[in-house]
A protein has these predicted regions:
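FAD-site-proximal beta/loop scaffold in flavoenzymes
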Residues: 123-139, 226-278, 282-292
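Short, well-ordered coil/turn residues at beta-beta hairpins
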Residues: 108-109, 115, 148, 230-231, ...
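Phosphate-coordination loops involved in phosphoryl transfer and adenosine-cofactor binding
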Residues: 2-4, 78-79, 141-143, 196, ...
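Beta1-alpha1 glycine-rich phosphate/pyrophosphate-binding loop at the start
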Residues: 3-72, 153-180
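Glycine-rich dinucleotide-binding loop and its adjacent helix/turn
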Residues: 111-152, 156-159, 164, 250-253, ...
C-alpha cells in the first residue's frame, strides 16, 4: 500500500503534525509503539507552554492534544517501526506488523535515556531502576526514591514525585545544571540533595535497596525503594537505514534533513532544546513542508 505521509511517533511533535495534516486532507498514518505523549507524560508542571498561565500537568496537556487529534478524525496506530529506508516511491517502512511505502515521512521518535554503569544483582537492577516516572508501577506515596542526575529533568521529576508524596533524594556527580527556578523550588520543598557522588553499586536490602557511591575518596551508602535515572538523552534515529543516516544534513534547518520528503521533528532533532512548544512548532512546520512537497510531486 502506498501512503501519502506517515508520522513515526506520537509525542507532542507527531500529534501536532498529525492535526495539521489531517485538516489538510492528507490522512496521515500515525505510528506509535507505546502510549501517546512521549516524555510530556512524565512532566510535572508545564509552565513554558502558552495558554496556561497557572501551568498544566504534563498528563493533562497530553490528554488535551489527544482529544484535539480525535476531533479532527486522526487515528494513532500502535506499531513498532523497525526500519525506514529509501524506495522508488519515496520510503519503505517496516513495522512489526506490516511493510508499506510512503511518499513522505516525519520522524518524531523522540529520545532514549542514556544509561549509567550501575553494578549489582540483575534482579535488583531490573526491578528497582527506572528511566521515566511513567515506568514506576503503582503509587509512589511514601516511597523513598533516589533520582540520579542534575539537569532539568532530574529536578522536575523530583518536584513531581515529591508532590505525589514520595520521599525524594537527588544524587548528582557535580553541581546542578538546571534552571535556577527548579533549584529554588527543590530547596523550598526541602528535597534532599547529595552533590559530588558517583553511584557505582546497587544491592538489595530487606527494606528496599542500598546505593553505594564514591564521594570525596570515600564510599557512602544511600537507602531507598527505587532509583530513577535522569542522566541525559540520545536521539532515536536507529530506525533510519544506514543510507538515510549518512545522508542527513546538518540540523541547522530543522525539520528539513537534506533528504526530500524526510523530516525530523521535536526532541529527536533538537539536542538539549527539549520543550513542548518547540516540538509542537516543529511538527506544524514539518507538516506544512510535507504538504508543499506532496503538492509539488503531484504537479510533476
Amino acid at each position: 500500500m502506498d501512503e501519502k505521509v506517515t508520522i513515526v511517533g506520537a509525542g507532542p511533535a507527531g500529534m501536532a503534525a498529525a492535526i495539521y495534516l489531517q485538516r489538510a486532507g492528507l490522512a496521515p498514518v500515525i505510528l506509535e509503539r507505546g502510549a501517546p505523549g512521549g516524555l510530556l507524560r512524565s512532566a510535572g508542571l508545564v509552565e513554558n507552554y502558552p495558554g496556561f498561565p497557572d501551568g498544566i500537568r504534563g498528563v493533562e496537556l497530553v490528554e488535551k492534544i489527544k482529544r484535539q487529534l480525535r476531533k479532527v478524525g486522526a487515528r494513532i496506530t500502535k506499531a513498532n517501526v523497525v526500519r525506514v529506508a529509501p524506495s522508488a516511491k519515496g520510503f519503505a517502512i517496516q513495522t512489526d506488523k506490516r511493510k508499506f511505502t510512503t511518499q513522505a515521512v516525519l520522524i518524531a521518535t523522540g529520545t532514549s535515556p542514556k544509561g549509567i554503569h550501575l553494578q549489582g544483582p540483575a534482579s535488583v537492577l531490573r526491578k528497582k531502576v527506572f528511566n521515566e516516572i511513567i515506568e514506576i508501577p503503582g503509587r509512589v506515596y511514601g516511597k523513598k526514591i533516589l533520582i540520579i542526575g542534575g539537569g532539568d529533568a532530574a529536578f522536575d521529576y523530583a518536584l513531581n514525585l515529591e508532590g505525589q508524596g514520595a520521599n525524594v533524594t537527588i544524587i548528582t556527580r557535580s553541581a546542578p545544571h538546571c534552571l535556577r527556578l527548579l533549584q529554588e523550588r527543590v530547596k523550598v520543598r526541602q528535597i534532599k540533595m547529595i552533590t559530588g557522588a558517583r553511584p557505582g553499586f546497587l544491592k538489595g536490602s530487606p527494606k528496599g535497596l542500598i546505593l553505594q557511591s564514591r564521594m570525596g575518596g570515600q564510599q557512602i551508602e544511600t537507602a531507598g525503594d527505587l532509583i530513577l535515572l535522569a542522566c541525559g538523552r540520545t536521539p532515536n534515529l536507529d530506525i533510519l537505514s544506514p543510507d538515510l543516516r549518512r545522508r542527513l544534513a546538518s540540523r541547522t534547518d530543522v525539520p528539513r534533513t537534506g533528504v526530500q520528503g524526510l523530516y525530523l521533528v521535536g526532541d529527536v532533532a533538537r539536542g538539549n532544546h527539549r520543550q513542548t512548544g518547540i516540538a509542537v512548532g516543529d511538527g506544524i512546520r514539518a507538516a506544512m513542508l510535507a504538504q508543499d512537497y506532496l503538492d509539488r510531486r503531484l504537479t510533476k
